[in-house]
Swiss-Prot record:
Region described as Alpha N-terminal domain (alpha-NTD): spans on this chain: 1-226
Region named Alpha C-terminal domain (alpha-CTD): 243-340
Organism: Streptomyces coelicolor (strain ATCC BAA-471 / A3(2) / M145)
Protein's name in the database: DNA-directed RNA polymerase subunit alpha
InterPro entries: DNA-dir_RNA_pol_insert, DNA-dir_RNA_pol_RpoA/D/Rpb3, DNA-dir_RpoA, RBP11-like, RNAP_asu_C, RNApol_insert_sf
Amino acid sequence: MLIAQRPSLTEEVVDEFRSRFVIEPLEPGFGYTLGNSLRRTLLSSIPGAAVTSIRIDGVLHEFTTVPGVKEDVTDLILNIKQLVVSSEHDEPVVMYLRKQGPGLVTAADIAPPAGVEVHNPDLVLATLNGKGKLEMELTVERGRGYVSAVQNKQVGQEIGRIPVDSIYSPVLKVTYKVEATRVEQRTDFDKLIVDVETKQAMRPRDAMASAGKTLVELFGLARELNIDAEGIDMGPSPTDAALAADLALPIEELELTVRSYNCLKREGIHSVGELVARSEADLLDIRNFGAKSIDEVKAKLAGMGLALKDSPPGFDPTAAADAFGADDDADAGFVETEQY
């Protein structure tokens, strides 16, 4: 069985709707294999929502104008295509817009039903004069990729229903690059950097997760041909290996004071792993182990990125130490000895 080092994935947030994802180390050649697959999936296969058709009061087709509206219907449709919406419904839903002039008509004037949200309310849709009036229905559906107005046109649809181009994808832009990275003495491993920019309807990390899920489902089809076939197994991640090493350390490595060290040894706590399995309350049950010893242990563990087992809500180690009669400064029956 061949075992490769498990890559790690980290996210560098550029802004709310743009992130860079770094995957490393990858076996030589896998950077481009994975990067190209992720990019194509992100651009074409992430589910989203979009307006698929509209109906404007008093309008029969798109090649006309609306009285009192500066923009013609074609320009109005171009503006509507820039709407960023999300929908929780699997079936088509209708949003309504009613506005009396004069003034601008924006996406904020749209009244969406429950489960539908307009994410760019400042988008200007039309301009009305003093006599202008705009009443419109907008049908929203879920889908993926791009669907043209011709494809959205339904057989036998009502007169006045105007299909529009639908851009379902919540992803605006995806780029990737592959760099060399080093693992021990080898310098030919791949480092994949994927830059993802999305619309306001979805965060980049959610789009990345959706792409990963889709690819796993598709590649699973090949795996099902023979689930016992040999492949390259991923070993433990570097983080997991480092954590295991830290937990295996003897408590001598923490360089605690003699008092704290001896108390822990008498309790049978010999490793960091055994220590983090105890809560503050557990440690205060140990004779002569008080609040100052608790603070010392917590500080040492924090330096390693570790912590004690969760204590009960509202737990105060100082008050508990007083209740137990533990005092780190003096104890008549306690004799300090050197570490052994």
